[in-house]
């Protein structure tokens, strides 16, 4: 059965983007899972709308000691649950979803995604989940990569999808299994249907390192999965006989969790060095097979989360800065990891004026992929990036204003001038996309301020 190592929870999360808690790690009486499952079966059979008012026992899972311990580590103490939309159970059936990242709301707001663990999704399975029961399908290690989310108008949530034509062409509405499927049981069991093939090819075409589909199975009854809000995933069809579906339904509850506090982060010249040269026992992927770009990303996020450090002050000579600049400006969606990795690599050497200047140049670049990578790199620099983000908010380009606004929320100095700037953008910017980011940026700034010595003054 699948489960994570509690002693390496942060390590697993910043690399894989997902951790799994066994029923023992969750820490409630196993009988509770059976009670929830039986109640849910009855409500489902009676076609009731299922929520916590129908099954109040689900709240005991949210209060479980193992869940609290894991969430405290990943998104900080006093984390909260989004009290509306999508906190609901799902039943697995005959259809496949396309690969997607859940919407970053409000719908089509085209907001940048937080690379730091601010949003978390929690999945709870009251029953065991075997490989034929429609296990949730994920793409581990995909949480830091995406596509142009500014000018792509082909879908409802920016471009956080793989092969959105799968949806547009109607394949998501075609049953893969069950009595209305046109596939044979052999095709379904061997995962050789047109749906299976196309969904696998969508992953392969990214050409991103370590990227392979991973079905979250087998799971014991009462397992909890915590994964990054940025992880590509999809709902999956059942592969067993249709007669089993009603007898043994597969339920999954989903909750959106978010960070409400954030400890002050410092620059550190001697951060905790953690090794990524190992086999991921969950996915069986060899992490040492990756390039330096992934390690730069993982190093940053491990130290941010586990050691409260913003950057790793590594000395960068001119040759290294030049190499990273070339990677930051490289073309092609397949090179997304190189651009993002280069940005974090430059951030780690931002004590070098040359490295910082490359990130500033990238922020003002016309290409969205470079600008986005540079934004994350400058966020990795910390408060030192305040002035360049302030400058970006005055641009004639709404997309650059959006990047600057996002950056101020993430790392802008907790100073009145930053609050005033974000407030002005919220009230006066001509772009709804920028105003949306400004509203969230004020919340991000408040999240940082409440944990600092300046909290009373700033609030």
Protein language model annotation of sequence segments:
Residues 226, 231-329, 339:
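Non-heme Fe(II)/2-oxoglutarate
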Residues 90, 139-147, 256-262:
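Short edge-strand/loop segments of extracellular domains
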Residues 117-123, 133-135, 211-216, 250-252:
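Extracellular structured ligand-interaction cores
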Residues 132-233:
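Double-stranded beta-helix
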Residues 109-131, 218-219, 226, 257:
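Short, conserved beta-strand element in jelly-roll/cupin
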Residues 1-114:
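Non-heme Fe(II)-dependent double-stranded beta-helix
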Residues 318-332, 350-364, 382-394, 413-427, ...:
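Amphipathic alpha-helical scaffolding segments comprising HEAT/armadillo-like alpha-solenoid repeats
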Residues 298-319, 337-352, 369-384, 391, ...:
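Structural detector for internal amphipathic alpha-helices that build alpha-solenoid repeat scaffolds
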């Amino acid at each position: 059965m699948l489960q994570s190592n509690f002693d390496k929870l942060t390590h697993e999360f910043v690399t894989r983007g997902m951790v799994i808690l066994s029923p023992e790690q969750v820490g409630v009486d196993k009988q509770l899972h059976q009670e929830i499952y039986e109640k849910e079966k009855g409500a489902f059979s009676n076609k009731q709308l299922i929520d916590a008012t129908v099954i109040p026992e689900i709240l005991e899972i949210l209060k479980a000691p193992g869940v609290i311990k894991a969430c405290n580590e990943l998104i900080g103490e006093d984390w909260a649950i989004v009290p509306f939309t999508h906190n609901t159970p799902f039943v697995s059936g005959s259809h496949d979803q396309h690969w997607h990242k859940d919407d970053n709301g409000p719908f089509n707001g085209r907001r940048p995604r937080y690379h730091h663990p601010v949003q978390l999704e929690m999945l709870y399975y009251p029953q065991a989940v075997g490989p034929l029961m429609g296990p949730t399908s994920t793409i581990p290690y995909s949480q830091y990569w995406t596509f142009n989310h500014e000018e792509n108008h082909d879908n409802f949530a920016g471009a956080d999808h793989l092969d959105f034509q799968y949806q547009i062409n109607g394949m998501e509405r075609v049953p893969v299994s069950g009595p209305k499927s046109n596939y044979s049981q052999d095709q379904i069991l061997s995962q050789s249907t047109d749906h299976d093939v196309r969904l696998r090819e969508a992953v392969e075409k990214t050409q991103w390192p370590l990227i392979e589909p991973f079905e979250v199975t087998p799971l014991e009854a009462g397992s909890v999965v915590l994964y990054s809000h940025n992880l590509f995933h999809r709902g999956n069809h059942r592969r067993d006989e249709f007669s089993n579906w009603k007898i043994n339904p597969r339920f999954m509850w989903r909750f959106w969790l978010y960070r409400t506090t954030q400890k002050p982060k410092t620059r550190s010249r001697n951060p905790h060095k953690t090794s990524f040269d190992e086999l991921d026992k969950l996915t069986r992927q060899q992490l040492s097979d990756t390039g330096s770009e992934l390690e730069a990303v993982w190093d940053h996020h491990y130290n941010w989360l586990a050691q409260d450090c913003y950057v790793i002050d590594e000395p960068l000579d001119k040759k290294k800065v030049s190499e990273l600049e070339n990677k930051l400006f490289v073309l092609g969606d397949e090179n997304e990891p190189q651009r993002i990795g280069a940005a974090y690599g430059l951030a780690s050497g931002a004590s070098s004026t040359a490295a910082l200047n490359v990130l500033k140049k990238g922020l003002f670049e016309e290409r969205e992929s470079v600008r986005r990578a540079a934004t994350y790199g400058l966020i990795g620099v910390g408060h030192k990036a305040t002035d360049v983000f302030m400058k970006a908010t005055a641009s004639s380009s709404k997309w650059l204003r959006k990047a600057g606004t996002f950056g101020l929320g993430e790392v802008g100095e907790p100073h009145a001038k930053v609050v005033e700037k974000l407030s002005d953008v919220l009230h006066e910017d001509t772009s709804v996309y920028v105003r949306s980011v400004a509203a969230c940026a004020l919340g991000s700034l408040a999240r940082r301020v409440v944990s600092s010595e300046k909290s009373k003054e700033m609030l």
